[in-house]
Amino acid sequence: MNIRSNPQQTVPAVTTGPLSSSRKIFASPDAAPDLRVPLREIILSEGAGEPNLPVYDTSGPYTDPSVTIDVNAGLARSRKQWVLERGGVEEYEGRQVKPEDNGNLSTDKAARAFSAYHKPLRGLDGHKITQLEFARAGIITKEMIYVAARENLGRKEQLERAEAALADGESFGAEVPAFITPEFVRSEIARGRAIIPCNINHSELEPMIIGRNFLTKINANIGNSAVTSSVEEEVEKMVWAIRWGADTVMDLSTGRNIHTTREWILRNAPVPIGTVPIYQALEKCNGDPVKLTWELYKDTLIEQCEQGVDYFTIHAGVRLSYIHLTANRVTGIVSRGGSIMAKWCLAHHKESFLYTHFDEICDLMRKYDVSFSLGDGLRPGSIADANDRAQFAELETLGELTKIAWDKGCQVMIEGPGHVPMHKIKINMDKQLRECGEAPFYTLGPLTTDIAPGYDHITSGIGAAMIGWFGCAMLCYVTPKEHLGLPDRNDVKVGVITYKIAAHASDLAKGHPAAQLRDDALSRARFDFRWSDQFNLGLDPDTAKNFHDETLPKEAHKVAHFCSMCGPKFCSMKITQDVRDYAATLNDPNSIGMSLSGTAEDGMKQMSAKFKEMGSSVYLDAEKVKESNRVL
């Protein structure tokens, strides 16, 4: 349902309440029993004969009926205490909001500001601040304990079939363990193979981990534009996206009220929030890339660090010497951030200030533990341009920048394409692992063909499933509106569900120990004609139920042994059940029939005798066979 926490004021209305036949449960890790790690438990019907199924949950408190949601106040700031307990930080006044932060709007056009203000924190010199620094020092943080419990879906020990699942999969060199421990999480972060995006000022966050040895994650993009959307719509899009499974959300707003929109989102977001700071910096100079300066960009970084943004897309790999490599492309430079920096470089005939000031960017981001998402500004925008020299030159530079960021103590992931046909996808994954020291890869799709506007969630979902299998850690969703317009609420859901399918399929292929539990539970429900369980175990129970009820809407149909596809006489699963029931009677010593094995044996004897009677020849006269069959 949609609720407004205060109907007298204009505040966002958001979707709350549990998903169908689900409830919020919490795991308490042995290493930190005070932590409450959220899971969603799918409640099965009484006749299921099996326990309820816990699944990963990204929805935050919005699906917890015991929590009163007040969007105007924001979520509980539980993680702030963790940060303060570790020490090494200070609270300070912070930067004042400036008119240009929201597009120099007049009072009547400005969105309502978020009412609660919290002084920001920043790290002190000489102290460990980032998750990478703690991991390298051998220190397991509460965030690491938390994500380990999430990845195990609350289990305290490995599954019985964990080793078999790992052996059955093909991981392409990934090292997925049978059970995730906090120590394993620490070691992966220390090696740079995983990140926990968690700005020390995003206290509302429920920590999660991104890395190829963990569950494949997905990101949903939201954000306004100069022509459409509002603060209210974007906050609801965020809540809606995480309801259906988005692990992180990027606010890509390019219109007005950028600062205010981001503040509302962050204060109500239980998942990591990412941005592309160059978008807001460009708005501050009235959309003219030539007027961008390092000082303006740095001020924007500080603004967003203090608000609590968890990761920044920074296109520092777009170098002056690479721009000419795009000249003969079919679609040129398609990244907004990449095209902005390319124009600046050409106008000033200088190296990008993102590249020349990269050390300073690292020092700044480290103080707040903001993770890098090193942007692929030269990614291919068509399959004709896939894997060209421009794309790979930038990727090689991103590898160099990764090492610099690691040396500075910053967490890093790498962004990838884009538009890539199926046979060229694995080359991308292998090169990224090699060039970037196995830092997590985060890709937009990739789209595997360019012929389907309106269906690019499908063209990209194919590539996403493949690259996830090959080792990509996080998949950025694509909606049906890709290349066509700003996605609305329904487009967000379609994009998220499509990418949850791709991510889950890649986990199955890698042999993730827990991945197949849900598949098997749904398959059993399907075979047993437990329609409600089948709906509820799916990624989108509402749509599954609606499709079923279009033709069989009555409640009695929820227990029927058929659906409208085949009807009662041609249901393969019902026929299989009948065969099993018949076989069971044959094996019953009290049955009037004989045993199944006996029936088969007698049948073989009859056919053997017939073969001999016909002359024991492999090739027989057709007329003799017909005559023999008439006799039989």
UniProtKB/Swiss-Prot annotation:
Pfam families in UniProt: ThiC-associated, ThiC_Rad_SAM
Cofactor: [4Fe-4S] cluster
Reaction(s) the record says it catalyses: 5-amino-1-(5-phospho-beta-D-ribosyl)imidazole + S-adenosyl-L-methionine = 4-amino-2-methyl-5-(phosphooxymethyl)pyrimidine + CO + 5'-deoxyadenosine + formate + L-methionine + 3 H(+)
Residues covered by region (Disordered): 1-26
Coiled coil, from the record: none
Quaternary structure and interacting proteins, as annotated: Homodimer.
Protein name: Phosphomethylpyrimidine synthase
Species, as recorded: Bradyrhizobium diazoefficiens (strain JCM 10833 / BCRC 13528 / IAM 13628 / NBRC 14792 / USDA 110)
